[in-house]
């Protein structure tokens, strides 16, 4: 995959003609506000009401820390140091990017926001993370970003990921946004940070009918044609599943070639769908898919595997 920075002349020329934006960058404040509202709405009378409420509180903590302690400009992302070639190679690749220690400052702030609301179980997790050394927390983060989930407490992973995601989301705001993909390679991971998607979202409005995959880490969305499997690019054996009806706003797209699946959210059927919240709230669809022998290809920041299970 390559990402090319457009000169101003091309940007202006393209503005007057329809095109499918290759990348959609999140507005951090709006993203968290929408997520909080959606979690609140979906939690009403839901079998997992308590956990959805907890997830909403984590998003509230992320929003509060974003507003109170925004990170400074990273000098590595200055225009002088970040070339078009750099942008073409997953510029914020989660396993290559050397994290600034500020991510741990964000983590401590998120834990402080959560502490007054925490029940005994959550409080124990928070206090354990607080007692760890910086090196221990960095080690957990390394394993988490490498998807070595079997070595990590799923309860701790939620908070570590929340801080990492808040850090990466702000880094994305610091790179040029006037860029686009020139090839369709490796679209099963985020072209910015190389992380897995949460779900795909079928847009309405200006991007009517276009499919975008939503990154679980940096929250960027990237365009991928709907005729391909999001995991293996094959086209011949795609099926769609839902729990209630054919016009459901949340479906699972499965692939008979790689035997994986990823949720698809349809804004036309419910304009309020939100990648992380709706994916988590539709967990019973995941159960159905796993019973069919299919493996989830996406990653939800509130659904890490439990190594003790």
UniProtKB/Swiss-Prot annotation:
The keyword Secreted does not apply. One of its GO terms (cellular component) is cytosol. GO terms for molecular function: ferric iron binding. One of its GO terms (biological process) is protein maturation. It comes from the Bacteria. It is found in: Cytoplasm. Keywords: Cytoplasm. Belongs to the FdhE family. PANTHER family: PROTEIN FDHE. Necessary for formate dehydrogenase activity. NCBIfam families: FdhE, PRK03564.1. This is Protein FdhE homolog. The lineage of its organism: Bacteria, Pseudomonadati, Pseudomonadota, Gammaproteobacteria, Pasteurellales.
